[in-house]
């Protein structure tokens, strides 16, 4: 299973997108670098930071871009 996260950057900034489980444990860092302004997307293939597949369930993802921070839920189905 894969999922695509889409976001829009109004200006060039450092972006960090991290996936967490429902207990707040970090599962996967998807992006952690500076990106140019524009419409962006990143694909998560349900693999954690250690290269292991994760279980189906509810996950949180947090997008940090400059001063902007947003945390949202997603459901991973297998």
Where are these regions (language model features)?
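Extracellular and select intracellular beta-sandwich modules with Ser/Thr-enriched
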Residues: 68-72
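Short, surface-exposed loop/turn motifs with a glycine/proline- and acidic-biased composition
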Residues: 6, 12-14, 31-66
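Surface-exposed, proline-anchored Ser/Thr-rich loop/turn motifs
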Residues: 1-12, 19-25, 56, 75-78
């Amino acid at each position: 299973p894969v999922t695509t996260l889409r976001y829009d950057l109004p200006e060039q900034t450092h972006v960090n997108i991290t996936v967490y489980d429902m207990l707040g444990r970090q599962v996967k860092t998807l992006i952690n670098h500076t990106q140019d302004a524009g419409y962006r997307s990143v694909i998560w293939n349900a693999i954690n930071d250690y290269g292991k597949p994760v279980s189906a369930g509810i996950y949180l993802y947090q997008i940090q871009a400059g001063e902007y921070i947003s945390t949202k839920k997603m459901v991973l189905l297998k």
